[in-house]
């Protein structure tokens, strides 16, 4: 009997718990959404209309007026209180009899000029600081207008002449040899005034518009593999063995 050679540290052993991949359906640990109610309803089923039940509403009292605890004045109307003019009588204000002027507050000797005829009297005070007798402008404070030149005021002015430097043009020192020569003028094109021959412009070659994308060549096609228009033998496809731990595809959710 030959001994089996094991690779690594794994050895065949009994599973410690259930392997969830062996089950094709969800176990009890999954919370399946309910098919009744409104909250968390399963999206794979149609939800029927739901109705709520509640108690009967409270009936309103027949008499909604304020009770006898309110004392409403019958003289109060929507425009205010219906009353005639009323006056209030208060007590006399307290008079402070002790705050009276004494004998020293009066000057009866000064009342003669107001009661009897009196001579005019003058008062002598100190000199004011805001007014000075000698505050007149001096000779240098005036700016007399000019009496010479063209800008005189109130007088006729004589003609005035200005003296400036010598001009370089038109003078006796002007060099008449410094005149423009024939080359200083731009020559007029002959074709402006005479017959002009036709002119032609030669441009680059114009290429016709076309498709410059990459297209497949003869070796890119495989006509021997065409089975749509030609008869062919039956073809069998071999798949692979699916694992037992793979979850099956649920197509019909109903």
UniProtKB/Swiss-Prot annotation:
STPGR repeats lie at residues 180-205, 216-241. Keywords: Cell projection, Cilium, Cytoplasm, Cytoskeleton, Developmental protein, Differentiation, Flagellum, Repeat, Spermatogenesis. Residues 207-226 are annotated as: Disordered. It is found in: Cytoplasm; Cytoplasm, Cytoskeleton, Flagellum axoneme. Transmembrane segments: none annotated. One of its GO terms (biological process) is cell differentiation. InterPro entries: CIMAP, SHIPPO-rpt. Testis-specific. The keyword Glycosyltransferase does not apply. It comes from the Eukaryota. Pfam families: SHIPPO-rpt (PF07004). One of its GO terms (cellular component) is cytoskeleton. Belongs to the CIMAP family. Outer dense fibers are filamentous structures located on the outside of the axoneme in the midpiece and principal piece of the mammalian sperm tail. May help to maintain the passive elastic structures and elastic recoil of the sperm tail. Microtubule inner protein component of sperm flagellar doublet microtubules. 'Shippo' is a Japanese word for tail. This is Ciliary microtubule associated protein 1A. The lineage of its organism: Eukaryota, Metazoa, Chordata, Craniata, Vertebrata. The gene is CIMAP1A.
């Amino acid at each position: 009997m030959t001994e089996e050679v094991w690779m690594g540290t794994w050895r065949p052993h009994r599973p410690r718990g259930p392997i969830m991949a062996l089950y094709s359906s969800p176990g009890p640990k999954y919370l399946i959404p309910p098919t009744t109610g409104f909250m968390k309803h399963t999206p794979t089923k149609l939800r029927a209309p739901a109705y709520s039940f509640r108690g009967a509403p409270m009936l309103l009292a027949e008499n909604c007026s304020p009770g006898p605890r309110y004392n409403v004045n019958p003289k109060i109307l929507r425009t205010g209180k219906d009353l005639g003019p009323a006056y209030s009588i208060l007590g006399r204000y307290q008079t402070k009899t002790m705050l009276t002027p004494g004998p020293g507050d009066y000057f009866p000797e000064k009342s003669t000029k107001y009661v009897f005829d009196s001579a005019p009297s003058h008062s002598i005070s100190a000199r004011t600081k805001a007014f000075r007798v000698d505050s007149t402008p001096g000779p240098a404070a005036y700016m007399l207008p000019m009496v010479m030149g063209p800008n005189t005021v109130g007088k006729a002015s004589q003609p005035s002449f200005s003296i400036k430097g010598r001009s370089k043009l038109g003078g006796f020192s002007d060099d008449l040899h410094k005149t423009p020569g024939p080359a200083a003028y731009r020559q007029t094109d002959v074709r402006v005034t005479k017959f002009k021959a036709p002119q032609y412009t030669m441009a680059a070659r114009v290429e016709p518009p076309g498709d410059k994308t990459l297209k497949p060549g003869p070796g890119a096609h495989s006509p021997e593999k065409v089975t749509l228009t030609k008869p062919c033998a039956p073809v069998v496809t071999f798949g692979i063995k699916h694992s037992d731990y793979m979850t099956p595809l649920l197509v019909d959710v109903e």
